[in-house]
Amino acid sequence: MNYLFTSESVSEGHPDKVADQISDAILDEFLRQDEDSKVACETFCSTGLVVVGGEVRAEHAYVDIQSTVRKVINNIGYDKADYMFDGNSCGVLSAIHEQSADINRGVVRENPEDQGAGDQGMMFGYACRDTEEYMPLPLALSHLTLQILSDIRKNSHDLMPYLRPDAKSQFTIEYDEHNHPVRVHTIVVSTQHDEFVAPELGNMKYDEAVRQFGQERVDKAMHDKIEKDVREILLPKVIASLPEKTASLFKNDYILHVNPTGKFVIGGPHGDTGLTGRKIIVDTYGGRGAHGGGAFSGKDPSKVDRSAAYAARYIAKNLVAAGVAEEVLVQLAYAIGVAKPVSVFVNTYGTAANGLTDAAIAEKVNEIFDLRPAKIIEKFQLKNPIYEPTASYGHVGRKPYTKAVKVIRDGKQVEKVLQFFGWELLDSVPKVKESFGL
């Protein structure tokens, strides 16, 4: 029997994502100056105010918190006083202090390979065959829709000139009994916007139009214009960017909700308080698979909440790409101060190839992949300023790329080519195939 599954995403202008990006930008700046920085940075943002707190241990770094925060906010697009949250004028308070010596003692070792996990906990990675990126389709489409909406706002402003930074999307996909996507069932797009007068009412200011036509008529015309643009500008761009097989799932009978409350002018941190780590399902698999509960942003890679979750995604993706199973969930668990994971668990949901059991796959995973924190950090080059791009539109399911970045190493500024989203690479597929005899 067919069933429906739904996932959501939020834009870089969503208040919680503003907080995530600030936390990761501060982390990046510490790592740019001192690759051994230990950082746990949390951000709170509200009307006209950002508060940054947390723990840091960095011997060779000084970060200008004020300028780092303001740069992030302005880059997102909060640069006007009308938004009631403006990177040029908002208050920025810092309450960052030194990391606990007790935690540091458990992480730092004389032999770097013996580095202990920064905390206890369990982390999950997931992969499936819904998309070319091995991600659940509802989440992938939700992310893509908002990425294209953001691109319109920043680079094709004339197409939808009223757009503001805050936005959300949600896709409901119909699946068949074999867990294959059948069609797009429902789309929800909520986007913050200026108060404007729809062209059909004439060229005038909003207040003047309200006096002439009444609030209800003006706001309905405004809403209808936004809905028309989403249907005729945004969604065609989304569909055009998809592989043919996925694009064919957009049949003419899908349900579309645009700004269902009718109006979305007040948004961003002025509309809702933003906090680091409050969008962990958006950051990962949209409700598919599982989540260990630990957020990612603002944490250096000694925190296995982040680094081990990336490693688990890498393992799951390489297992699926190698043909070990159609769908894979990997759980890793650690104890603070202990290098090796206390457990490795694999669930293939009954899709494993060649009669393989989940326990046998988990045993092989332990043999193939070195899951000590130091080795995970080394594998994915995690002691580098690569984190701010992860803080919006998903930490996983992204296209890996390299980029030259200026960093300070041994007291000198050098240009270093860094790998971004290295946990999305499929470079272990040959090794996995060989190990499983595929």
Regions found by a protein language model. Name each.
Residues M1-A40, V429-V432:
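N-terminal, positively charged regions that mediate nucleic acid binding
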Residues T6, S67, N74-V265, G397, ...:
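Glycine-rich, mobile lid/loop segments that gate access to catalytic sites or pores
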Residues E12-L31, D130-S150, K299-G323:
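Alpha-helical support elements that line or immediately flank enzyme active sites
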Residues S46, A325-E327, Y334-L438:
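Internal helix-turn-beta structural module
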Residues S37-C41, A167-I173, Y254-V258, V324-A335:
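A short glycine-rich, hydrophobically flanked beta-strand micro-motif that places a catalytic Asp/Glu
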Residues A40-E59, I336-K340:
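Short, charge-patterned binding micro-sites
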Residues R278-I280, Y285-L329, K340-N347:
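C-terminal catalytic subdomain
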Residues E8-V10, H14-A19, Q115-T131, V265-A290, ...:
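Conserved phosphate/anionic-ligand binding catalytic regions in large, soluble enzymes, centered on
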